Amino acid sequence: MEFKIVNTICPYCGVGCGLGLVVKDGRVIGIHPNKRHPINEGKLCAKGNYCYQFIHSKDRLTKPLIKKESGFVETTWNKALEVIAENLKTYKDEIGFFSSARCTNEDNYILQKFARVALKTNNIDHCARLUHSATVTGMSACFGSGAMTNSIEDIELADCILIIGSNTFEQHPLIARRIMRAKDKGAKIIVIDPRRTITAKNSDIYLQIIPGTNVALINAMINVIIKENLIDKEFIKNRTEGFEKLKEIIKKYTPEYASKICGVDKELIIESAKIYGNAERASIIYCMGVTQFTHGVDAVKALCNLAMITGNIGKEGTGVNPLRGQNNVQGACDMGALPNVFPGYQKVEDGYKLFEEYWKTDLNPNSGLTIPEMIDESGKNIKFLYIMGENPIVSDPDVKHVEKALKSLDFLVVQDIFLTETAKLADVVLPAACWAEKDGTFTNTERRVQLIRKAVNPPGEALEDWIIIKKLAEKLGYGDKFNYNKVEDIFNEIRKVTPQYRGITYKRLKIDGIHWPCLDENHSGTKILHKDKFLTDNGRGKIFPVEYREVAELPDKDYPFILTTGRIIFHYHTGTMTRRCKNLVEEINEPFIEINPDDAKSLKIENGDLVKVISRRGEITAKARITEDIKKGVVFMPFHFVEANPNVLTNTALDELCKIPELKVCAVKIERI
């Protein structure tokens, strides 16, 4: 009887908790705490504790599938790859790729390289487009980098923690532990959220904002801080530019003015601003409740402005800290799984010559299409789509639009571990290994690169993602460009072409991981960014004054409620993995909609009633959950349940700067069934 513990990293959110997979007779049978891990110190959330339960699911894909008139039939790898290769040759100029935040750095690197080297296209994107593209665009403009500025451990050192648009206690529970430690030491916690979440219930001040009014509220806090002279004059003078213009624009954003927009008492705005402004070390934490709007970039810039004018950047216990929602969404961005940048955020238009030298081939010098653009162009300028580890028919806005787009393709390939809702539409389905069945690296929300380790073999004929892409490259005659014998070979190439990873090696990652940038093998990594200068062209932080703008779809007499969406503690994204975990399903396995008691009374809806939720794009059915935790006029639904997927209802309106959809707000009506 073989029995072993394999230390690896959790496959869910972006915290990057360490855990041990308990293996017996070639199967993972449980989780062993990794008490030495610097992030979670042996603790795990519910999802982490039961993450092993989907590994050996009977639903796992085990053989390649080709769709015939009668449905899917099993085939050989050789046949499947030949069919894909022939279609790639046919549609060479009309191809798009979706990469994946669930896959390793190595998997993402090799797919974006395959797209660019073998197909000469920059039409590659992944789900960061739907979550933190606003962060990358906004923070890069202000700071020169779109990543979390401080480490997770560092949060404990803050005197004030401003949490906006993040239910940290449910979605990043091990970061919430750090927040509570800071609170125990005297830190003040400010929470801004339309829902009175468990995070809000643990705050010192709670501002129950109307969804989509973040910019007005943040600007009002800045107004108070300037008026009360709580700014850091030396930091502004020596480290930033643009403050005078901000002062002018911010004058109209008085607490009284913002209160009418945000639905928050002006005294709470004033008190929050004073607490943040008076703190010696103030940290900002945010998530999708800031980014998933048509003005998401503006909200990110506003938060950066708030941090810069108070000098809360570049030192312990401070910073602007966007929490990543997926295990490797940071890494997928780092690897260049984006249409406008190569690995290391080197812009396509500026960096293509350099990568032509690296990869010894001609490259396309023009930026490619984003996910929303590829969806819109499906059946027109995009005829072939290759999707690795993404489920857009559940996760993307306006599901009917996505389904119609995917069905209009001439050829669709899906590479995944389960036959997802998206995979069911594919012409060819390729069975992939899950995270427990491969070696590689993930990069977590704080830029910490960590090793994941293979614990068991993939089921049946399933293969690691990078091996599948390598085999496909060989079919197209590009085997010499993908001559890797093991996954570490790919990482060594990543180091050469990605400046932030240059000093990181597998050997150095064996203990605690390393925060990028790590410039050489003697460098210990960088826990705090922007200590002495920003990563902008002149080293100064750029203050960008931003104005409040309304959301794309406001409630009206026909659709009087604002629907906002999100996650719950027991499930993850489209539910593909967590809804195959017995213990998590036992906690909750049915969709619901949260409704304020006053709204429920006016609609004659009682707790547990089935209701229809209807938008201009579709309708779904769910059980009513009556709660004072949701603001009047606002309703909330999680998007884990495909049988009542709120993305049937959501709007495809985009932030024009980063192309993120406005997933956090759409107008709906509710009818009792």
From Swiss-Prot:
It catalyses: oxidized coenzyme F420-(gamma-L-Glu)(n) + formate + 2 H(+) = reduced coenzyme F420-(gamma-L-Glu)(n) + CO2. [4Fe-4S] cluster binds at C10, C13, C17, C45. Transmembrane segments: none annotated. SUPFAM superfamilies: ADC-like (SSF50692), Formate dehydrogenase/DMSO reductase, domains 1-3 (SSF53706). GO terms for molecular function: 4 iron, 4 sulfur cluster binding; formate dehydrogenase (coenzyme F420) activity; formate dehydrogenase (NAD+) activity; metal ion binding; molybdopterin cofactor binding. PROSITE patterns: 4FE4S_MOW_BIS_MGD, MOLYBDOPTERIN_PROK_1, MOLYBDOPTERIN_PROK_2. Binds 1 [4Fe-4S] cluster. Residues 3-59 form the 4Fe-4S Mo/W bis-MGD-type domain. GO terms for biological process: formate metabolic process; respiratory electron transport chain. Its EC number is 1.17.98.3. Its cofactor is [4Fe-4S] cluster; Mo-bis(molybdopterin guanine dinucleotide); Zn(2+). Keywords: 4Fe-4S, Iron, Iron-sulfur, Metal-binding, Molybdenum, Oxidoreductase, Selenocysteine, Zinc. GO terms for cellular component: membrane. InterPro entries: Asp_de-COase-like_dom_sf, CT_Formate-Dh_H, Formate_Dh-H_N, Formate_DH_asu, MoPterin_dinucl-bd_dom, Mopterin_OxRdtase, Mopterin_OxRdtase_4Fe-4S_dom, Mopterin_OxRdtase_prok_CS. Pfam families: Molybdop_Fe4S4 (PF04879), Molybdopterin (PF00384), Molydop_binding (PF01568). Belongs to the prokaryotic molybdopterin-containing oxidoreductase family. Dimer of an alpha (FdhA) and a beta (FdhB) subunit. PANTHER family: FORMATE DEHYDROGENASE H (PTHR43105:SF14), RESPIRATORY NITRATE REDUCTASE (PTHR43105). Catalyzes the oxidation of formate to carbon dioxide, with coenzyme F420 as the electron acceptor. This is F420-dependent formate dehydrogenase subunit alpha. The lineage of its organism: Archaea, Methanobacteriati, Methanobacteriota, Methanomada group, Methanococci.
